């Protein structure tokens, strides 16, 4: 598998995992007034996870292959999910860092806390995170 194909696979899987994670469980309903906030937060979670070099995920996948990783689909998929989880964790660390530093941009786009600023979002979001 080429690095480009792997990178595309990682990007797609991260978007799928993040979208699935922030989705409400079946049958759970929020008050209508919460819907715009949920949609904005879901969109921002996916947007914050886009981009980056994905070196951690690619290195994890390469190490798995180099160490004779099982070629079975189930194990490959589990390793892909693990490598994507590493990237999502890194994104969470970057979002935290941006809040602490009150950064305006991340990867050329508004930082998550800036993108979500406005009605329904408390400016004191990062208080106590230091």
Locate each region found by the language model.
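Conserved N-terminal diphosphate/IPP-binding helix and adjacent helical/loop segment
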Residues: 1-85, 91, 95, 102-120
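Short, intrinsically disordered, charge-balanced linker/junction segments flanking boundaries
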Residues: 119-130
């Amino acid at each position: 598998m080429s690095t480009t194909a792997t990178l595309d696979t990682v990007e797609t899987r991260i978007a799928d995992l993040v979208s699935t994670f922030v989705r409400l469980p079946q049958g759970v309903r929020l008050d209508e007034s919460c819907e715009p906030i949920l949609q904005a937060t879901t969109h921002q979670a996916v947007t914050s996870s886009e981009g980056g070099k994905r070196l951690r995920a690619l290195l994890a996948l390469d190490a798995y292959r180099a160490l004779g990783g099982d070629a079975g689909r189930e194990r490959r998929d589990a390793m892909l999910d693990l490598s994507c989880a590493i990237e999502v964790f890194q994104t969470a660390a970057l979002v935290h860092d941006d809040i602490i530093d009150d950064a305006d941009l991340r990867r050329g786009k508004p930082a998550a806390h800036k993108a979500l600023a406005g009605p329904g979002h408390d400016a004191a979001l990062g208080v106590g995170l230091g």
